[in-house]
């Protein structure tokens, strides 16, 4: 019970945060992840002290205990339409009844208390899809801005060039929700080299499936990973869950490499089908095979697609662009907080 109360509202964290805010006197507080240790207590402290607060929505935990709307191999949106208590009996959080109950309690408590309507000045969603999901859950539309993630340009001193080797790349956690099984199933019928970079619970399955056309590289450092991505014909992102963003997508764009991704969630708003990549039906190895074969047989068009992907990165996902949007959100939050009453 003590753990449940701490996740819903941590008195220890609230005292520490209040002390730090009083010491530092910030113009604004920007909260990224509060779960599980800080708890939404941070928003109440900021409200009490009259400090504007911005919160970035990095996942869906605040409206669905699964954090991804993914359960037992499929998308599950019940938490948008009803309470989250159903998740407790399904062990959606770390396969634990108690853990799932605690997270569901947090979701329902702050829904009841109106925390998200009354204690936060501005929210940042990473994509339009993510913003719409929060609005569907009843969050205030007028308070949610869109600001994507960004990465430093990994190749400022090098130009995008024609790929010399022919291969595809998967980079990510090796788990069910990332679509790893779909990828492996598709590659049984694809004669084209694929390099798999990552680690996770399905690692043994992936390593055992390695063959002439499928190479498991395990975990790689960032520089090596980006080099593999830069030289690839395409990157594959076969996720089965709703992701608020796809960092690997903008990494691929920065490398001048197009993306083949599931036609699902935020990916649809990040990838322009046929322009910066291709979209396939989620969970369908047949659809994925079709898109890979198109890439294999149209390498000149794939190169042009990569140039457009690189342009997309420069237009939307650079630190400079991110800074401008962030400052705009901060200014809004400060302005809107000036006249508020608590």
Annotate the PLM regions.
Residues 273-274, 278-285, 292-299:
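Conserved acidic donor-binding segment of nucleotide-sugar-dependent glycosyltransferases
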Residues 204-227:
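Nucleotide-activated donor-binding/catalytic signature segment of Leloir-type glycosyltransferases, i.e.
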Residues 62, 75-76, 80-156, 216:
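Donor nucleotide-sugar binding/catalytic pocket of nucleotide-sugar-dependent glycosyltransferases
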Residues 287, 294, 301-316, 322-328, ...:
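A short, well-ordered alpha-helix in the C-terminal region of glycosyltransferases
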Residues 226, 249-254, 268-269, 275:
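Short alpha-helical segment that forms part of, or immediately flanks, the ligand-binding pocket
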Residues 258-261, 271:
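Short hydrophobic beta-strand element within catalytic cores of glycosyltransferases
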Residues 122-124, 160-178, 182-189:
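Conserved donor-binding/catalytic core segment of Leloir-type glycosyltransferases
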Residues 230-244, 257:
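Acidic donor-binding loop of glycosyltransferase active sites
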């Amino acid at each position: 019970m003590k753990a449940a109360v701490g996740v819903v509202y941590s008195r220890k964290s609230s005292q520490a945060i209040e002390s730090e805010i009083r010491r530092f006197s910030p113009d604004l507080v920007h909260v990224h992840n509060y779960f599980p240790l800080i708890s939404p207590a941070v928003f109440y402290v900021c409200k009490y002290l009259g400090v504007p607060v911005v919160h970035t929505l990095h996942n869906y935990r605040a409206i669905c205990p699964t954090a991804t709307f993914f359960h037992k191999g499929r998308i599950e949106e019940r938490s948008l339409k009803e309470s989250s208590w159903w998740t407790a009996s399904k062990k959606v959080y770390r396969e634990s009844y108690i853990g799932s109950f605690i997270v569901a309690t947090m979701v329902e408590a702050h829904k009841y208390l109106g925390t998200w309507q009354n204690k936060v000045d501005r929210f940042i969603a990473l994509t339009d899809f993510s913003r719409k999901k929060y609005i569907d859950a009843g969050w205030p539309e007028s308070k949610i801005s869109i600001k994507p993630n960004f990465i430093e340009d990994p190749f400022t001193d090098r130009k995008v060039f024609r790929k010399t080797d022919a291969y595809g790349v998967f980079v990510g956690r090796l788990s069910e929700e990332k679509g790893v099984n779909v990828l492996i199933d598709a590659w049984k019928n694809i004669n084209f080299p694929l390099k798999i970079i990552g680690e996770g619970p399905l690692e043994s399955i992936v390593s055992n499936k390695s063959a002439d056309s499928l190479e498991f590289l395990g975990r790689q450092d960032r520089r090596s990973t980006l080099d593999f991505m830069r030289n690839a014909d395409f990157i594959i992102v076969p996720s089965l869950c709703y992701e608020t963003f796809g960092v690997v997508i903008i990494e691929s764009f920065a490398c001048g490499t197009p993306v083949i991704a599931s036609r699902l969630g935020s990916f649809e708003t990040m990838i322009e089908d046929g322009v910066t990549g291709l979209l396939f039906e989620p969970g369908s190895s047949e659809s994925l095979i079709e898109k890979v074969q198109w890439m294999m047989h149209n390498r000149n068009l794939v190169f042009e697609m990569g140039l457009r992907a690189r342009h997309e990165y420069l237009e939307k996902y650079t630190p400079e662009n991110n800074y401008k949007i962030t400052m705009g959100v901060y200014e809004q939050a400060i302005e809107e907080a000036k006249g508020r009453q608590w």
